[in-house]
């Protein structure tokens, strides 16, 4: 199940519910993002390149195709169509859909009364391999994941924080980050 829209680079198969087909019009965007990443670019650098080269965002493409997100895009300046965020790029780089796998059970509701979503640990996810055509090879995907992991834990002084990857937000389940404000040198989490 992929929600209302297929991930960027794919379209929903009109003949088979829940199946994805490669979108020949947008697959190049995914290939470009992974190519930049495998050649050492980080998410911020990739985002900057996508904006500079005026690559359309997934939301803009959905607006153009289906008329969705009209409240965001209708009557807005053209730059909004290319306003990529680092979070979007990071999400794409971590998405196993692009190697042909479906991953389910990533999040759940806090309770039947509270519909707020929380991320589940990776060990509880369900992976179904080879459910659709891959856009990215598993080798390229693995290389990018290793680069992300190596880049994430490095500090400017070359050390790794002692609680790196261990301290999680109680509300959403994401890892907390520690840093120092560059202007006043105050630490923050």
List each language-model region with its residue ranges:
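Conserved catalytic breakage-reunion loop centered on the nucleophilic residue
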Residues: 1-189
